[in-house]
Amino acid sequence: MPLKKLESSNNQDIIAEEVALLKEMLENITRRMIGDDAFTVIESIMVLSEKQDYIELEKVVANISNQEMEVISRYFSILPLLINISEDVDLAYEINYQNNTDTDYLGKLALTIKDLAGKDNGKDILEQVNVVPVLTAHPTQVQRKTILELTTHIHKLLRKYRDAKAGVINLEKWRQELYRYIEMIMQTDIIREKKLQVKNEIKNVMQYYDGSLIQAVTKLTTEYKNLAQKHGLELDNPKPITMGMWIGGDRDGNPFVTAETLCLSATVQSEVILNYYIDELAALYRTFSLSSTLVQPNSEVERLASLSQDQSIYRGNEPYRRAFHYIQSRLKQTQIQLTNQPAARMSSSVGLNTSAWSSPASLENPILAYDSPVDFKADLKAIEQSLLDNGNSALIEGDLREVMQAVDIFGFFLASIDMRQDSSVQEACVAELLKGANIVDDYSSLSETEKCDVLLQQLMEEPRTLSSAAVAKSDLLEKELAIYTTARELKDKLGEEVIKQHIISHTESVSDMFELAIMLKEVGLVDQQRARVQIVPLFETIEDLDNARDIMAAYLSHDIVKSWIATNRNYQEIMLGYSDSNKDGGYLASGWTLYKAQNELTAIGEEHGVKITFFHGRGGTVGRGGGPSYDAITSQPFGSIKDRIRLTEQGEIIENKYGNKDVAYYHLEMLISASINRMVTQMITDPNEIDSFREIMDSIVADSNIIYRKLVFDNPHFYDYFFEASPIKEVSSLNIGSRPAARKTITEITGLRAIPWVFSWSQNRIMFPGWYGVGSAFKRYIDRAQGNLERLQHMYQTWPFFHSLLSNVDMVLSKSNMNIAFQYAQLAERQDVRDVFYEILDEWQLTKNVILAIQDHDDLLEDNPSLKHSLKSRLPYFNVLNYIQIELIKRWRNNQLDENDEKLIHTTINGIATGLRNSG
């Protein structure tokens, strides 16, 4: 019997109780704000939506005043938010329950390690596997930080619901506190008044480390080692999870990312992790009251204690406390040295004898900062060894062991920061350098072969650099060189791992990679033997993915590249872009091209003796590579995951997965288990069968690509339809990220960034990028020969890639609503533009019918009852928001709203994104 996924659906009765209570409180608060008469409008709207009487609903909404719209749109935005919290709480409860009762579930790490332990290479896999979630600042998180903080309080209160029901805590006081926070949310601005700055994005993402990720990653790694040990596998220093980050280093299309933001990103990280260590050591200081009159520490602990400036008479016989105090003192100095900030939380409130900081002894014996995390860990190891010498192994478990584990994982920063820039920017900078050095006057006009010859010659000219103080530089070149210089300084200061990769957006040639090498060489990050920053191509469009094999084969053939890769443990990372390939060719073409590219690139790596590792640039929606993480990883081509995989975690997905430590632990556990299972499990053993599957997919995808591009790029009215029948203009003005919605002025679909493209299709409920072109392509294949439907059904049952592909379409279709989409189509001014909707509608119906036929299902989401139930409970609420949004857009475009009222549209955008739970 297959294992089930952990889902909150097992607690539907509790969720129903919680939602009823939350709804009752929100209704009372709203009624008090607007009065009984106005609240009857909300009640009538709700009834019409539940009955799906959309014609009457449209009429009622059209008669609501702008003033009434504000509270009504807030009500219907906050209600799905509260439902989300209830579901998240009960998922966390389910996770804890299943773990504490030792129940098996899909992706459980204990099962994965147990299955692996019996294999000959089991220990090697466990030692080497490394999954890297990379948190990005992509503008899809529509919630303000203030709102997220309030929802965190509500989440904590709902965690106590069962205790309140049982009388373990005072029910009335619990209800009052819950009511208070809901009232605060209802009266707090949902929408940001100003656009986020990069520094805000850095600060915002740090709350996830502070609140959940540090603890979850540390606990999971400790458990990982313990589980391996249980099966006789002693692991040295495994890192099954390490974290990555783009915020502060991703300047592709974002002019606000600079050398200063890169430095700030690393510095804030360092501050957060050092504060964590200081807090944890303060707790250990309070706990370790062991007296030397009862148990004698070893000489190293005595040495640490003797260096402490905690000279309190009450600590004379407590060497462990004094040793921890000394370690804390050194951490404080380390924080000052690395961040130029004092230890923010190092105070008497966490148990320290703060008077010791200014004691005379501190002048005679100055405390020195740690040179590296290795030195910090050595002091902790000394305490551990002393405890072991005295037979106190039980005292090591828990806080001390987890702090030591955290040091191994994080060191003095939390996540490796990626740099990213568009290839065209690098080409412009290199062209300027070559011209300024009188080497090539017009580099951009050279052929690809000529470019590579020039670049390789310069890379071999050591230690010569191209830039000169005597030659004036453009602002762009100055800015780029400043960023690379800062990267080198941060690596020297915090360690090599703080910045390991530089990603090249829109990689189209080998010269794109050598151009980056030239820029890195200018600041000393690349020479003939070594690349301190790995050059990572990002292949994004269908054409670039098709060409990726030849590009990488040519790149890997160069001796200098082999030297660079050798210094990186023989790994070459390649990033795959899901968003642009989807916008370029549609869902099927994107998914299949990415699948084939991984197979081809893996083979090229093997030919050159290089381990190709993949970085998956996935978004929250299916149209941007989203979907269940476990299924996404286990459906990758067999052999494409060697031992390392990186994937982006973006926008609202970060909050959904890492908003609390229990759910964070579970999602990280899923990532590790999925990666290990894909590394060792080949689902289809018959090579002839997989070859036939590929032939079928090639045929279907070719048709799908043609169908998709015929509408998106060949239909002269499609551009106007998208811009008039979706809230793309309003989305672009929403203050949800520091980056512009487009790299340049938008005059065609290709110029629009993938995120607002997908976001807007989600808002008008068509979900176009996640399914268009699927139905017609499959229908053509089915109609070609008898038995083709049965072949597709067999593929769905036996091929994880195909199963995941269709399950994602199923999910997207379930969130779409063609009745609502029709109303958005009426926003278009001309009939020929509005008629585009009917092409979309025909394809939607065909896609739904074909998907159900291949799955052999009667209804959508038959395999996903949890999501089906969740959507059923929330759809009536955010369907209302769509009708409100349509009415507000009409008024805005007809100048019936003033500028202050534009935020009403933004409120509906927020609410719809909240209800869908994956916006971009």
From Swiss-Prot:
Protein's UniProt name: Phosphoenolpyruvate carboxylase
Function: Forms oxaloacetate, a four-carbon dicarboxylic acid source for the tricarboxylic acid cycle.
Catalytic activity: oxaloacetate + phosphate = phosphoenolpyruvate + hydrogencarbonate
Keywords: Carbon dioxide fixation, Lyase, Magnesium
Residues the record marks as active site: H138, K583
Enzyme Commission identifier(s): 4.1.1.31
Domain of life according to the entry: Bacteria
Pfam families: PEPcase
Gene name, Swiss-Prot/TrEMBL: ppc
Source organism (scientific name): Streptococcus pyogenes serotype M1
